[in-house]
């Protein structure tokens, strides 16, 4: 007595589905282009160019050295006072009054770097 074709199909489908679920799929990366900046990859953080409105998204090419620069820390090649914000021990960020006086713009607070 032969097994009905539909039952065979069903079993095959179940087996295929089990195999598919058992298989480890590679992590899916986000699409590598964005609609607003087609040349840039999406996992590179986008640059916000409206600097006068947004102090928190700045270009990576800043005039002052990056935070937590290990080599600079080792060589002591820069002063911490040339940063607009500092991270205190409690984990909060404070504006740096020293930077306001001695930063790239001197006393001109309305000029963004």
From Swiss-Prot:
Has a role in meiosis. It is found in: Mitochondrion. This is Meiotically up-regulated gene 98 protein, mitochondrial. Keywords: Meiosis, Mitochondrion, Transit peptide. It comes from Schizosaccharomyces pombe (strain 972 / ATCC 24843). GO terms for cellular component: mitochondrion. It comes from the Eukaryota. GO terms for biological process: meiotic cell cycle. Its main location: mitochondrion.
């Amino acid at each position: 007595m032969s097994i009905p074709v539909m039952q065979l199909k069903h079993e095959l489908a179940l087996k295929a589905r089990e195999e598919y679920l058992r298989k480890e799929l590679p992590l899916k990366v986000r699409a590598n282009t964005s609609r607003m900046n087609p040349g840039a990859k999406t996992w590179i953080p986008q640059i916000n160019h409206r600097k006068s409105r947004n102090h928190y998204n700045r270009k990576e090419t800043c005039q002052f050295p990056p935070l937590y620069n290990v080599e600079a820390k080792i060589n002591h090649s820069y002063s911490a006072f040339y940063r607009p914000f500092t991270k205190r021990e409690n984990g909060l960020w404070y504006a740096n009054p020293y930077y306001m006086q001695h930063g790239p713009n001197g006393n001109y607070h309305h000029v963004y770097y």
